């Protein structure tokens, strides 16, 4: 696994042949690997989102992530086998210091997560964005913003229009969803698969010109905010 993590875009091989080069064996399958880090405050649901995507269900129990929690899922996109590595990072600073350089290495995309029922987690987003700027070498790495726990309607503190304004300011598409609600399983899937499709095709998010001449990144065919609750 270490070798997979070290390169910016690795190719992994698998073969059903017991002996390399055996007669009649097909060439080994090749899979591109994309490393996506999921960051945000503790208890915003990062682990639950990654677990929902990789395991297809909500975890029976969760504990605070210490360091990095790593999950991987292989998917087929347009006939190509792709491996998606999700790095679920600790939200508490005391668990992060020794790991920061490691999990930011060779990142292909970033998912920022906040808890829609916790305004403090939303206010922490600028600090997470600044951390990314300090450790990521490339400026064109795709980034998306995810508001989690939208099923808790009566407890929501972060209105969609406020989150959308923040997303526009930082050139990110916004998604609102719930990792817990089983009805949103396909929606969590769509978030990560949309990102995987963009990484595979190497297509940038579509540029749109704002009235004050700022450039904003928008999804190519999707509205700026997608809410499935």
Curated annotation (Swiss-Prot):
Impact after mutating residue 47 to N: Affects interaction with ATG16L1
UniProt effect for mutating residue 92 to L: Does not affect interaction with ATG16L1. Induces lipidation of LC3. Decreased GTPase catalytic efficiency
The enzyme's E.C. designation: 3.6.5.2
Binding site for Mg(2+): 47, 65, 88
Post-translational modification: Prenylated.
InterPro entries linked to this entry: P-loop_NTPase, Rab33A/B, Small_GTP-bd, Small_GTPase
Record-linked PROSITE patterns: RAB (PS51419)
Known regulation of activity: Regulated by guanine nucleotide exchange factors (GEFs) which promote the exchange of bound GDP for free GTP. Regulated by GTPase activating proteins (GAPs) such as SGSM2 which increase the GTP hydrolysis activity. Inhibited by GDP dissociation inhibitors (GDIs).
Keywords attached to this entry: Autophagy, Golgi apparatus, GTP-binding, Hydrolase, Lipoprotein, Magnesium, Membrane, Metal-binding, Methylation, Nucleotide-binding, Prenylation, Protein transport, Transport
Annotated compartments: Golgi apparatus membrane; Golgi apparatus, cis-Golgi network; Preautophagosomal structure membrane
Superkingdom of source: Eukaryota
An example Gene Ontology CC term for this record: Golgi lumen
Chain positions of motif Switch 2: 89-108
Reaction(s) catalysed by this chain's protein: GTP + H2O = GDP + phosphate + H(+)
Lipidation (S-geranylgeranyl cysteine): 227, 229
Cysteine methyl ester found at: 229
Principal location class: Golgi
Tissue specificity note: Ubiquitous.
GO molecular function: G protein activity; GTP binding
Record's bilayer topology term: Lipid-anchor
Binding positions for GTP per the UniProt entry: 43-48, 62, 65, 91, 148-149, 151, 179-180
Keyword Cell membrane: no
Subunit annotation: Interacts (GTP- and GDP-bound forms) with ATG16L1; the complex consists of a tetramer where two RAB33B molecules bind independently one molecule of the ATG16L1 homodimer; the interaction promotes ATG12-ATG5-ATG16L1 complex recruitment to phagophores. Interacts with ATG16L2; however interaction is approximately hundred times lower than for ATG16L1. Interacts with RIC1 (via C-terminus domain); the interaction is direct with a preference for RAB33B-GTP. Interacts with RGP1.
Family membership: Belongs to the small GTPase superfamily. Rab family.
Protein name stated in the entry: Ras-related protein Rab-33B
Source species: Mus musculus
Lineage of producing organism: Eukaryota, Metazoa, Chordata, Craniata, Vertebrata
